[in-house]
Amino acid sequence: MKPQQLATQKFSEHYGYSAAQTVFAPGRVNIIGEHTDYNDGFVMPCAINYGMAVSFSKRDDSVWRVYAIDIDEQDEFDLSRPIEPSEHKWANYVRGVVKYIQEKCPEFKQGADLAMTSDVPMSSGLSSSAALEISIGKTAQVLGDLPLGLAEIALIGQQAENKFVGANCGNMDQLTSALGQKDQVIMIDCRSLEITPTPVPHGYSIAIINSNVKHDLVTGEYNSRRQECEFAARFFGVKALRDVTPEQFIERAAELQAENELAYKRAKHIISENQRVLEAVEALKANDMVKLGQLMAGSHDSMRDDFEITIPEIDYLVELAQIAIGKNGGARMTGGGFGGCIVCLVPDGKVEHLRRIIADNYEKQTGIKETFHLCTACDGVHLI
């Protein structure tokens, strides 16, 4: 059963009446451009056909009752009182979004009953949290008929995750969940929020392979990467690493390396990765899948060697995928790192070959069974 059907059904069972409306917000996969978003850089994700559905109805008071179907828990809070953190981590994503919507729209106090469910695997790097934030943001916007655009809802979602949940994420995940387009990857300039849609090449599929090694980014590694990038930006005297050209980096690389080895390595990844994203857009437009494959491989190597966010299981998955796909297409880790998924752009005729090579080798080598998802690029958040 699809999340939107499950949300509607469980809403009726839980509350004893039918939901008025349902919102669906997709997860995302990032084709290339990793950890560049919070450096004001470039990313190239697409929204995917896995996501979060929220069925909801207005109440005649200011209370939100939120039923999380997948874990059978409920949260309740009152929009006419200051919104405080909950002991349930999932509930803080909901409360945080509503809190920052109220900062923008102080008159918003419309109560509601909600039931929500997701088929985005948790801790996979496919943005289960952004799908939750954007679905809640859109729900609130509909409930209150609020004058909020999709990009604003995305930035409110990011604010909630940064300030209320305590994960220092960039804005890519939320922007993609809000602004995704069917059959397109979207290059996002994370500073101007300008979007450049580019069609997914004809005859290619997007495969996402979950290593099933879990990660949780609220803890230290992610935040330390941000601090190292900020150190490097200060070293170059710029607002963000986006403002450093490859030539400027090369000119002062030895000096930065002598001062702070880690900041040097992190900056090397970010600056080269921004360049790879810009080249990837051109490769896609030219239908040059050999070039795109090389850029994806370069991105993975840089994440492994300079940003140091991959793990042996992920490196092995990428290696297997690259063997299966060959030169036309590519594979790399996607998401924050330390587990999660790899993304592949694979010729349709090689999908089963890819699936088989990984099934025959990954578990044998690691003792963990992978999960294989074929995805399509989808529209962003919408009412169903």
UniProtKB/Swiss-Prot annotation:
Key words, A-Z: ATP-binding, Carbohydrate metabolism, Cytoplasm, Galactose metabolism, Kinase, Magnesium, Metal-binding, Nucleotide-binding, Transferase
Catalytic activity field: alpha-D-galactose + ATP = alpha-D-galactose 1-phosphate + ADP + H(+)
Active site: D173
Binding residues for Mg(2+): S129, E161
Entry binding sites for substrate: E34, H35, T36, D37, Y222
Pathway where it operates: Carbohydrate metabolism; galactose metabolism
GO BP terms, alphabetized: galactose metabolic process
PANTHER family linked: GALACTOKINASE-RELATED, MEVALONATE KINASE/GALACTOKINASE
Entry similarity comment: Belongs to the GHMP kinase family. GalK subfamily.
Record's function text: Catalyzes the transfer of the gamma-phosphate of ATP to D-galactose to form alpha-D-galactose-1-phosphate (Gal-1-P).
Name of this chain's protein: Galactokinase
Gene that encodes it: galK
